[in-house]
């Protein structure tokens, strides 16, 4: 079985990390590389029980600190081989044609696309005698910019993926790598499937993982021909029925680029309801003559629908609605009939109209209007309506001060009910509401005064005069000074490990203690 190599940058000199402690100056790297602190162990996500190989070389290149390592654990490779055989994503193969099919390399690239360097903290002066570089890890995503791991069978193939590495630097790396594999102790890899599953679960909850991998890939100048599927999520392709009548989306896009859309005009189709069938037949025949087009998406066999672009649909709809004849209702010779009044024969209606309105309106013309109807009922007199409304406003209604409290005959509150005018204006309602709120506030203040006076009386009878407040919790600075800082810095991202339930309990406990302290201070001030 051929060897498995991994290469990538552990830091990029031209990019500043998000945290100041992750900064790794170039002079420090050159100084530590001269000390000969190589080889280093290669593990998974800084887990010393999951050591899978050794680092074969660290190189100070113009772009950054480059690392070449070899995976030597056969136990770990057996696990990767079994996972790759059951993964549907890896079984489907690579979308990019130049890449040779290699399930093991694809599984490693998808699971551990990041590199992380564990080094000594620069500000720590107590670790002068210990080596600066501790180990290198493959992880889900690195904390430093540009830390992408490229897996492959040959070192030269890995170096060709990086466009930021010059030809002279590639020769330098190939000459400096220790290709002679030494013996590897399989006992160094004591992790099991549960450890790998827990690691993948933690990696899936890292925020902004995919954007970080895409940015790292751009910083390293990686070519498109890589096995890293985490940084290139598949794009859902939605292709229209035809290229002439719709939109077409490109199959693949570069990271950060916009989807290219090609549109064209839709010819106007003349006809009535047969226009849909003719347009569909025309576009289907035109697709056969178009070269280099994306194959059409066939409609499901159980569906009778036809895929039609939006522009073609609206154009056909406009043509169809424009050619339909407009139906104009015929003009009636007779005047409109009011449905709310009953039509009567000529003899009855003429007699009633003549009885009430013959002197004012005279008799109607029988030749023009062959039927008769009642005249409309006169409207309700506005003056009478205004009089009744003003009379209603003068009424007074009994209303208690509180709707929640009930009173019965014989109670003292029953005879003290106030009479208030009925309020119809919004401003008056708002003023009444504010008065009620103010009255409730005054009552609450009076109750608080009574309780405070009762507490004073109780405390005056007790032998202890003052209450000793509880001890306050330590501040953030005191906690930082009490807890020791780690001496080894691991540059791999991990999800937040704060227990939210415990944090909520601590916050509620702190708030309760703070309220007790404020209440005790207020009582002491009132006594003094």
Curated annotation (Swiss-Prot):
Belongs to the herpesviridae capsid scaffolding protein family. One of its GO terms (cellular component) is host cell cytoplasm. Keywords: Host cytoplasm, Host nucleus, Hydrolase, Phosphoprotein, Protease, Serine protease, Viral capsid assembly, Viral release from host cell. It comes from Human herpesvirus 6A (strain Uganda-1102) (HHV-6 variant A). Its EC number is 3.4.21.97. The record marks 230-231, 491-492 as: Cleavage. The active site is at residues 46, 116, 135. Region of interaction between pPR and pAP is called Amino conserved domain (ACD). The region of interaction with major capsid protein is called carboxyl conserved domain (CCD). A motif (Nuclear localization signal) lies at residues 416-422. It comes from the Viruses. Residues 508-528 are annotated as: Interaction with major capsid protein. It holds the Pfam family Peptidase_S21. GO terms for biological process: nuclear capsid assembly; proteolysis; viral release from host cell. GO terms for molecular function: identical protein binding; serine-type endopeptidase activity. InterPro entries: Herpes_virus_sf, Peptidase_S21. The keyword Ion transport does not apply. Residues 270-288 are annotated as: Interaction with pAP. This is Capsid scaffolding protein. Residues 394-431 are annotated as: Disordered.
